[in-house]
């Protein structure tokens, strides 16, 4: 039967319950001795159709984006790839720095926040260098598209697997929630834009699956497993490393702070990332910056129009950038002045889920206003439905240790964006770091609510998934075609 959930023995073997101490961190999951974790990247039989459909959908989205690119994106040789990509790529607030790295191995992304992103892209850069010599065309866009499709497809597989194995949903519910999650505008864009978010999303979903499986089996996360998860997750996006620490704490408790575990799981990866940062900064970034300053010194006297354009851009950014706590590193990205409630309505739960028709896919650093209102009042109604479904999911998952872990990770994102204001003006592009929590909690509502209420929530979720796919995909495809 297609809707039959995975075999389970009893509620106490799978589902969390309060221990006798009745404390927050003593929520327990009883072990399921029959399950082991082997070759987690092997696609299982029931996941094959999902993987195939996902791959085709994500490949199509990437093809649409590549089709929209100008001919200059495919030129090879000793060219100014910064000017080619940075000045002509505008998709919301996403960056095209990976295209530049794949073309000439120059680093323009913030190295301190993405210390191993260059290492992830390096094989692609080597491949592109060989292909450019062979084809005389820059294949960076195609290489990045392949990487994104693979990452997005496995993200869909792990999302589905978490729904099936850890939340214990039937296949139909897992399909509905997977379609619902990837119908979100920000997630759909994440699977096709040349930024780090799609890779970060995969790292986080793999981490949730591995740690959740350990908890379900009554096992502890091994130090080398935590080390690998922390290295990959924090290496792609440093702040996400905190979530690996949160997950390790939920799984292993205070043993996380034992000298041996802490050294292997966190200190060793930090040393590796620190060494990688130092090498790239000293031998790639600094020489690159010095060369750029030299070119600027020679060019500026001859091109006063460049200084004028830079002044206009700086004035725009000053007018639309919130006031930071300090100009010190990391603190310079904070924001204490942008209204929080409007950010939640229009950007966090707004643009993150449904694109605004006005100023479609424009970049805040170029021309997009901080806040845009929807053309249709019904868009706010659908946003309210998503929020209510999320709230219901939080209620029904309140006894789940797995969901408390995921919600704690999402709370860290809320602290970063809503309290500190990190990236608040473009908070919608960070949705891949946390928004999977919404459908995960909804899965518990499907499972635990009374049948009539559960069926009503399924129906609303299915309708929203179909609507968001039609609405967001139509806007994206027509925009790029």
What are these regions (language model features)?
Residues 4, 146-167, 389-392:
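Transmembrane-helix motifs of polytopic, lipid-linked glycan transferases
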Residues 37-41, 241-271, 286-298:
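Perimembrane helix-loop-helix junctions
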Residues 44-92, 101-105, 268-284, 464-471:
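Transmembrane signal-anchor helices characteristic of membrane glycosylation enzymes that use polyprenol
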Residues 93-142, 310-394, 403-406:
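Lumenal/periplasmic acceptor-binding loop at the mouth of the active site in multi-pass
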Residues 159-183, 404:
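Transmembrane-helix signature of polytopic, membrane-embedded enzymes
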Residues 192-196:
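Short acidic/glycine- and proline-prone juxtamembrane loop motifs at membrane-interface regions
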Residues 199-216, 437, 441:
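Specific aromatic-rich, kink-prone transmembrane helix
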Residues 221-252, 266-269, 463-464:
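Membrane-interface alpha helices of multi-pass inner-membrane proteins
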């Amino acid at each position: 039967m297609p809707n039959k959930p995975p075999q389970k023995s009893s509620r106490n073997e799978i589902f969390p319950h309060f221990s006798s101490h009745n404390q927050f961190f003593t929520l327990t999951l009883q072990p399921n001795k029959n399950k082991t974790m082997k070759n987690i990247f092997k696609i299982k039989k029931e996941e094959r159709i999902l993987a195939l459909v996902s791959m085709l959908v994500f490949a199509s989205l990437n093809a649409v984006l590549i089709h929209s690119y100008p001919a200059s994106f495919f030129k090879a040789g000793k060219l100014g790839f910064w000017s080619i990509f940075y000045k002509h790529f505008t998709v919301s607030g996403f960056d095209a720095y990976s295209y530049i790295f794949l073309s000439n191995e120059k680093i323009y992304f913030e190295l301190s926040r993405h210390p191993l992103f260059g290492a992830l892209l390096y094989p692609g850069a080597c491949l592109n260098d060989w292909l450019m010599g062979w084809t005389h065309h820059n294949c960076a866009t195609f290489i990045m598209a392949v990487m994104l499709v693979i990452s997005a497809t496995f993200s869909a597989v792990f999302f589905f697997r978490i729904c099936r194995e850890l939340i214990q949903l039937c296949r139909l519910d897992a399909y509905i929630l997977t379609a619902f999650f990837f119908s979100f505008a920000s997630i759909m864009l994440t699977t096709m834009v040349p930024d780090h978010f799609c890779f970060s999303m995969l790292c986080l979903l793999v981490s949730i699956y591995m740690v959740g499986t350990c908890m379900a089996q009554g096992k502890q996360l091994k130090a080398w497993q935590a080390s690998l998860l922390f290295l990959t997750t924090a290496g792609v996006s440093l702040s996400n490393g905190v979530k690996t620490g949160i997950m390790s704490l939920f799984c292993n408790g205070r043993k996380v702070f034992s000298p041996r575990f802490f050294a292997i799981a966190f200190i060793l990866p930090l040393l590796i990332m620190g060494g990688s940062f130092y090498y790239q900064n000293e031998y790639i970034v600094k020489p690159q910056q010095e060369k750029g300053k030299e070119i600027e010194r020679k060019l500026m006297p001859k091109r006063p129009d460049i200084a004028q354009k830079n002044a206009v851009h700086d004035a725009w950014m000053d007018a639309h950038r919130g006031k930071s706590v300090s100009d010190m590193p990391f603190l310079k990205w904070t924001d204490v002045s942008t209204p929080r409630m409007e950010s939640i309505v229009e950007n966090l739960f707004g643009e993150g889920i449904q694109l605004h028709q006005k100023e479609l896919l424009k970049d805040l650093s170029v021309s997009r206003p901080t806040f845009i209102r929807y053309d249709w009042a019904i868009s706010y109604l659908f946003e309210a439905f998503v929020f209510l479904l999320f709230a219901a999911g939080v209620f029904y998952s309140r006894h789940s240790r797995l969901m408390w872990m995921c919600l704690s990770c999402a709370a860290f994102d809320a602290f970063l964006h809503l309290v500190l204001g990190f990236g608040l003006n473009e908070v919608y592009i960070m949705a891949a770091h946390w928004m999977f929590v919404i459908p995960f909690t909804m899965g518990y509502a499907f499972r635990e609510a009374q049948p009539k209420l559960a069926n009503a929530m399924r129906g609303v979720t299915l309708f929203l998934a179909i609507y968001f796919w039609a609405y967001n995909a139509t806007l994206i495809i027509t925009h790029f075609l």
